[in-house]
Amino acid sequence: MIISAASDYRAAAQRILPPFLFHYMDGGAYSEYTLRRNVEDLSEVALRQRILKNMSDLSLETTLFNEKLSMPVALAPVGLCGMYARRGEVQAAKAADTHGIPFTLSTVSVCPIEEVAPAIKRPMWFQLYVLRDRGFMRNALERAKAAGCSTLVFTVDMPTPGARYRDAHSGMSGPNAAMRRYLQAVTHPQWAWDVGLNGRPHDLGNISAYLGKPTGLEDYIGWLGNNFDPSISWKDLEWIRDFWDGPMVIKGILDPEDARDAVRFGADGIVVSNHGGRQLDGVLSSARALPAIADAVKGDIAILADSGIRNGLDVVRMIALGADTVLLGRAFLYALATAGQAGVANLLNLIEKEMKVAMTLTGAKSISEITQDSLVQGLGKELPAALAPMAKGNAA
């Protein structure tokens, strides 16, 4: 199979993975309206093509939280990576490390912090959920600090799990789920050999270490469902801010006022995100939410964004809309499921090449030159102010 884009990896992953795993990563909440809009809205962002700009010295390098990145991309925290490829978190982290970008380890990873951190040279980021069990949260933070994690990504948009209909149909949940998953596994031999037999233990490594016993998929579903905390407020985050020495990023911001609250709280960064359309269906896509948030807090706090990014052109679009850096989620997971570390490495190379093409043809020699002026129109509606006079002149 020829691989030229993330969409090719998606098609390959669908063939390789048991349906319960493919649809768990591919699906969204309710009717998946927001999931679709994440991709569609971003594709509507039109860029200004510029010519004769001497683009021979183009650079994708940027700096975030005093870390040098080869391009403004990091791998997002994704649960259960180790179920998509053998010791998947380690493989993805190695690919990111080699490319010179951060890898973010999820709270609900298969591989524990202590397995992933020593496998790479660059300090990884660690993602933490708001959970009822504050003892677990403190334990996870202590272990992340001990392992040298540089940045904490604190996910706040899951006070309760979203309603994901695909999971019930695919076997991730619903009646006879365990038996359905077993039957799917044995009929997908590549996955069964790579992960089912040789990817063990299939624990939730960070949780198992705390509970002192093995944990499997049923524990993942049950433990998380019982531990999300709907009572959380900014006040509850203060002890985490005091405990964590490094940069702290609040993930799950869609409203400008929440972004301002994050600045007042003292966060170092925010992630404009709707959890990949997996939480509340019908909310704004990240691409639509981003410009207003950037208007509110740009320059006061680092702005990251995720949800709907599938290629290097999408990265450039998100930066033009106001992001400093983006997080890749599903895109890298498709590649990981298809070809492990090599797949993720190839995807990152593709994204870098696509970014260079987009920047060359828009006349942006550096990441700092990708601005609102790079846009013809934001999301198919109003032109940015910088282009309004030109538009009026052309209308005549």
From Swiss-Prot:
State its location(s). Cell inner membrane
State the active site: H275
Domain of life the protein comes from: Bacteria
Q: Name one GO molecular function term.
A: L-lactate dehydrogenase activity
Q: Name one Pfam family in it.
A: FMN_dh
Residues binding FMN, per UniProt = 106, 127, 155, 251, 306-330
The UniProt entry lists the main location of this chain as: membrane
Which Gene3D superfamilies does the UniProt entry name for this protein? Aldolase class I (3.20.20.70)
Give the protein family: Belongs to the FMN-dependent alpha-hydroxy acid dehydrogenase family.
Which PANTHER family does the UniProt entry name for this protein? L-LACTATE DEHYDROGENASE, S -2-HYDROXY-ACID OXIDASE-RELATED
For this entry, the protein name equals: L-lactate dehydrogenase
Question: Could you tell me which species this protein originates from?
Answer: Shigella boydii serotype 4 (strain Sb227)
